[in-house]
Structures are given as structure tokens and as C-alpha cells.
Curated annotation (Swiss-Prot):
Integrase catalytic domain segment(s): 73-222
General function of this protein: Involved in the transposition of the insertion sequence.
Claim: Iron is one of the keywords in the record: no
Classification of source organism: Bacteria, Bacillati, Bacillota, Bacilli, Bacillales
Source organism of this protein record: Staphylococcus aureus
Gene Ontology molecular-function annotations: DNA binding
Annotated PROSITE patterns: INTEGRASE
Protein name, UniProt field: Transposase for insertion sequence element IS257 in transposon Tn4003
Keywords in alphabetical order: DNA recombination, DNA-binding, Plasmid, Transposable element, Transposition
Matches recorded under SUPFAM superfamilies: Ribonuclease H-like (SSF53098)
DNA-binding segment(s): 33-52
Superkingdom of the source species: Bacteria
Pfam families per record: DDE_Tnp_IS240
Amino acid sequence: MNYFRYKQFNKDVITVAVGYYLRYALSYRDISEILRGRGVNVHHSTVYRWVQEYAPILYQIWKKKHKKAYYKWRIDETYIKIKGKWSYLYRAIDAEGHTLDIWLRKQRDNHSAYAFIKRLIKQFGKPQKVITDQAPSTKVAMAKVIKAFKLKPDCHCTSKYLNNLIEQDHRHIKVRKTRYQSINTAKNTLKGIECIYALYKKNRRSLQIYGFSPCHEISIMLAS
């Protein structure tokens, strides 16, 4: 599939713009200035539209290829401000620290947590161990999951310290000062950011960190 058909700019320009934004804590204006320094004049609003268009595509391609997970999962959530109101980004990683999935919700309750875990099981199968924080909503959700999917009663472990690994994964989101104006904008952007970060972590754990290029990864994904 040609994802760059009828585009005014060359695909290399688009992949650089999208890759830089999704990988680094840069603004759309920063990306526009970087491209201008390379002799390419692109308005920052155009960069925004590219990110909104390609980030969900990259996320879907990544999810289709990402089907395996280790038996132990860690699940946590963090706060994301959207148009002045708090929303909640649920995140899951496996025993090796690889990202399983993310999900942005307006509410932090047992229904949201249950739906997220159910979604994970549908994609990766049943886990042997799930580590979460001690939030009451998560405990209720896990009790429902254990009953619904007939998991072992002791598969759920709550610990603030055992879950430190996944809390570190929130940092690359927290360092950004992005002001999201709608839930859809936030969803699209975060899907792209998490997709690239997941690929970065995979390269880092396979000792290929010095060869990681978000633009190269995007080119490969969109060429498949």
C-alpha cells in the first residue's frame, strides 16, 4: 500500500518529520525549524497533520506484528491532561519490559481497567502473573478478570516496588509539554509515540541502540 500517494512532499521529508516528533520531545514548530535548516519549508500545522495521519497507521502495523508476550505482565496508568482535564493512559509491559499495549481513557475505574486487561488477553492470551499497583479499581478489575477468564486465584500481585519498571516507562510521556486539545488528538499522538518507543526499547534490549533511527523504522513499517 502506498501511504504517500498524492502528497506534496517527498516521503523522506514526511518520515523525518513524523519520526523526530514521535521519538523526541520536540514541538511541531521545532520540527518545522529543523526542516527549514535542511532547505525544506514545511509549516508546523502540516507537521501536525502528518503526525495525526501516520501515528495511528504505525500503531496498527506495530500491533499486527506484535503478537507474543512473556507470561508476566505489569500494568499501570498515568495522568494525561487534555484540554484542562485529566485523562488516564493505561500501559502494560511484559517481563522483559517490552510494551504490550496502551489505552487512553477518560475515567480511571474498574470498568476501564477490566476492558484494558480483557483487550490484552484477547491479543496475547492468558498471563500467569499480573503485577499492578494497589489502586482499588485495579483490584476489582483483576478479580473480575480472574473469574471471567478462569485464571489462577494467585496470579494477581499488588506491589508499589515490583511495579517500578513500568512506572519508568511513563517518563518519556511526562517530559513532553504537549497540550492536547481533544481526546482524539491525544489518542493518535500517543499511539505513535508509544509505537516508536516500543521499537526503541526492543533495539536497546537487543544491544542495537546505537543503530536506532525512528525515520528508518517508520520507512520499513510503511513499506511493508
